[in-house]
Amino acid sequence: MPINSFENYPMSWKPSIDKAEKPIYKALAGQLEQDILNGVLLPGTKLPPQRELADYLDLNVSTISKAFKVCELKGLLSATVGSGTFVSYDALSNAYLLEDTKPTHLIEMGAILPDHASYEPLLYQLKNMVHEEDYEKWFSYGRAGESLWQKDAAVKLIQRGGFETSVDHILFANGGQNAIAATLASLCKPGDRIGVDHHTYPGLKTVASLLSVQIVPIKSENDEMSPESLEYACKNENIKGLYLIPDYHNPTTSFMSVENRRMVADIVKKYNLFVIEDASYHLLNKNPLPALASFAPQQVIHIASLSKSLAPGLRLAYVAVPRQYKEPISKALYNLNITVSPLLAELTARTIVSNQFEVLIESHREQTIRRNQLVNRYVAGYTCLGVETGIFRWLLLPGKMSGAEFEELAARLGVQVYAAERFVVGNSCPERAVRVSVCAPKTLEELEQGLMILRRLLDDLT
């Protein structure tokens, strides 16, 4: 029997469970998950203290702890030292933002894609490859990435993005997401924690959830990770690693200053953290800043993805890995992939060593600048963060409408944007903002049409 009476006692959650269902902690976790997904418990709700809930249900505190842990590993809850346990602000984002309720014709301004520029340099290389006498080898398994000259090409591309490395550090992955998954799978075990920005790349969140790796939001200061907050997390949150997007941060478009990169590098070296540096957007910058890996080469796994800067269909990423992590990450990539596509590895390497990749990048950059000029014209008077070479922008909303509400309303009118709720981490409060993909619309006319709709929505909010 409970020690105290709870008849008139205020509690944010008073579950009712069948104690005959064993194990009890799983039944309680299932009830908690359903109450979150069904909207009984809203994002940001603080749950009762574990001892209080244990008394109410007449259960051991350890049973409550296990149930909370199950939901925490699923990303439904966020526990903060000294503050308690909360329903994560992003707990419902996948449930209500990804439903298949889109109109038949929707102007795509949510997904991040480079512009639809000419892929002539790639086509030229591809035609040459398939007309070679031994063209069959491009369609076999092979050992793509083992060729030294292909690794030389990888080094050239990574150096172009701001990091000096060598071939003995290079691994090949089937895209950036694949490289992130392999890194977390090899360096983390279930329950381990990694630090991230309070809004971050959703693909990182899904991989972490799949592997039961917890992500801890680190507070920002002046639009970049606060060294003081990072140090606090190292001391009190027991984080094992860090995930960062230093350039064209997804979704907020911010850049880490060189000084901030140095300070973060000093902290990760001090606490021996591994760092995943997502360099998906480095090449968009004509004069890239030094990569974070430049300041902590023994700690940072530098991932140079090609889909955002060259072509979405190039599902390939070059990974510069510190020696201490190379063997476990290499094994993880092998177990996940066996190999990368010999066709894509060869095509990409030829495009790089011939310098044709510079033609592709410059073409993308010119088109992106033109598109951003349109964006600036239509959202003039509103706060739309980002630079002219960025392929997405971060639109801060006037009034009191949430990003999720704006996304839903925009979709009804024929435009897809992505709300801050898709990107928020744990119990961080989502900004009232949406991410707007500048280059996803197929034509300038389609982009302009989408911007006109967004402008009308913004004007209605003021």
Swiss-Prot record:
InterPro entries: Aminotransferase_I/II_large, HTH_trans_reg/aminotransferase, PyrdxlP-dep_Trfase, PyrdxlP-dep_Trfase_major, PyrdxlP-dep_Trfase_small, Tscrpt_reg_HTH_GntR, WH-like_DNA-bd_sf, WH_DNA-bd_sf. Residues 50-69 bind DNA. The modification N6-(pyridoxal phosphate)lysine is found at K308. The keyword ATP-binding does not apply. One of its GO terms (molecular function) is DNA-binding transcription factor activity. GO terms for biological process: biosynthetic process. The keyword DNA damage does not apply. Transmembrane segments: none annotated. In the C-terminal section; belongs to the class-I pyridoxal-phosphate-dependent aminotransferase family. This is Uncharacterized HTH-type transcriptional regulator YdeF. The gene is ydeF.
